């Protein structure tokens, strides 16, 4: 993989997740740290808590060795009041794109636990992103072909 140059505004969860990706590069074809705004970055539409349409920019787009594409937005518990709406819009997007393009997509809001060494996401709709019981653990080794 090519070197990654981080912007100074990278959050701690983003830094820690990036380290996980770098440690597991044998399981990953490529990954992209998405920007936070602008038409040059990947986003999906979601309806905010104020009922207005907004753009949601996931933090990471990852292609695993087995072809799975991961769309993750790193968070810590309680860090984003819009998290549920963003997550559920991303689940909708992944379902539609998986069927339309015959892709294996996983992703969602990704919560770092255990000092940001254990990363959990829900493959289904959620009504609370602060309770991760029952969520899947993202293990890059599971996608290594």
What spans do the regions from the language model cover?
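Electrostatic, structured charged patches in enzyme active sites and in nucleic-acid/phosphate-binding
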Residues: 1-145
């Amino acid at each position: 993989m090519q070197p990654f140059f981080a912007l100074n505004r990278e959050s701690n969860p983003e830094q820690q997740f990036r380290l996980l990706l770098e440690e597991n590069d044998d399981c990953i074809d490529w990954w992209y740290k998405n920007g936070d705004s602008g038409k040059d970055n990947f986003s999906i539409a979601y309806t905010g808590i104020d009922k207005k349409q907004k753009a949601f920019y996931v933090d990471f787009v990852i292609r695993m060795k087995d072809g799975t594409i991961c769309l993750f937005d790193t968070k810590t518990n309680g860090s984003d009041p819009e998290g549920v709406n963003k997550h559920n819009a991303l689940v909708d997007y992944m379902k539609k794109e998986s069927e339309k393009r015959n892709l294996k997509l996983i992703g969602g809001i990704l919560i770092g636990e255990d000092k940001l060494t254990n990363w959990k996401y829900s493959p289904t709709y959620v009504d609370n992103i602060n309770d991760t019981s029952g969520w899947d653990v993202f293990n890059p080794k599971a996608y290594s072909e």
